[in-house]
Amino acid sequence: MKFAVIGHPIKHSLSPVMHQANFEALGRDDSYEALNIPPKHFHLIKEIMAEKEIDGFNITIPHKERIIPYLDAMDAHAKTIGAINTVKIEDGKWIGYNTDGIGYVQGLKNVYPNLKEARILLIGAGGASKGLAAALNEAADHTLSVANRTMSRFDNWDLKVHTLTLEEAEKQLGDFDIVINTTPAGMSENQDVVIALDHLAPDTLVSDIVYIPYKTPILKLAEAKGNPIYNGLDMFVNQGAESFKIWTGETADTKAMKNTVLQQLQRRD
């Protein structure tokens, strides 16, 4: 079977080597490639996938919402979220799923067992944030707070969340047990920190869904303050494993996947 990940930019993605490690561990003769598709060329997505005979693919920034009009169906979870990170192509039909939130929460519970009672702030209101918000709403009792620079970004949100501006969030940081950055700030060469951490409580866990670099600027800042930190590696591995199960019905070798990603990250350092 042939799989892929689409995004822009995509050169930093470790999805191909991670999935290849899983294929080899399971003795499968599958392939997985990264496809850089700029927004201006996205209308060609059907032709591109047909030409490459792709059976399923992942979607990353900035296409998680852009893909929706091209789908024939979405599962109930993805419909609630309104963002897609996984597409299965079956008998010519494109079916959309979202495994981001599931993957993130699986890992978060390992580092924050008392997740049910946590007060959580998400930073960013893009497609990735929607996926996490849906899963965190199910996992935690408190109403989730989501902060974004542009409030109009919430106009197409159907999820029950408390919305606030970045400025409001900065002042209220001390009220949260977990703060999660879902924006691209800090990814690869981007050294931005989207929110000041001056009012952060001492024990608040600061997380970032980015895994390249291993410690983003916001995580370094939090660590310097003595706060616990958690990056996006487990989410990356777990969402990939969930996608693989959707495509094939098989359980992925997450140990092989994670070890391969860690090796690649060490080489980049």
UniProtKB/Swiss-Prot annotation:
SUPFAM superfamilies: Aminoacid dehydrogenase-like, N-terminal domain, NAD(P)-binding Rossmann-fold domains
Reaction(s) the record says it catalyses: shikimate + NADP(+) = 3-dehydroshikimate + NADPH + H(+)
TM annotation in the entry: none
Gene3D superfamilies cross-referenced by the UniProt entry: Leucine Dehydrogenase, chain A, domain 1, NAD(P)-binding Rossmann-like Domain
GO molecular function per UniProt: NADP binding; shikimate 3-dehydrogenase (NADP+) activity
EC code(s) of this entry: 1.1.1.25
Residues reported to bind NADP(+): G124, A125, G126, G127, A128, N148, R149, T150, M151, S152, R153, I209, G232
Keywords from the named record: Amino-acid biosynthesis, Aromatic amino acid biosynthesis, NADP, Oxidoreductase
Known pathway: Metabolic intermediate biosynthesis; chorismate biosynthesis; chorismate from D-erythrose 4-phosphate and phosphoenolpyruvate: step 4/7
BP GO annotations: amino acid biosynthetic process; aromatic amino acid family biosynthetic process; chorismate biosynthetic process; shikimate metabolic process
InterPro entries named among the record's database cross-references: Aminoacid_DH-like_N_sf, NAD(P)-bd_dom_sf, SDH_C, Shikimate_DH, Shikimate_DH-bd_N, Shikimate_DH_fam, Shikm_DH/Glu-tRNA_Rdtase
Residues given in the record as shikimate binding sites: S13, L14, S15, T60, N85, D100, Y211
Catalytic residues identified in the record: K64 (proton acceptor)
CC terms in the record's Gene Ontology section: cytosol
Subunit and partners: Homodimer.
UniProt record similarity statement: Belongs to the shikimate dehydrogenase family.
Free-text function comment from the UniProt entry: Involved in the biosynthesis of the chorismate, which leads to the biosynthesis of aromatic amino acids. Catalyzes the reversible NADPH linked reduction of 3-dehydroshikimate (DHSA) to yield shikimate (SA).
UniProt protein name: Shikimate dehydrogenase (NADP(+))
Annotated source species: Staphylococcus carnosus (strain TM300)
Gene that encodes the chain: aroE
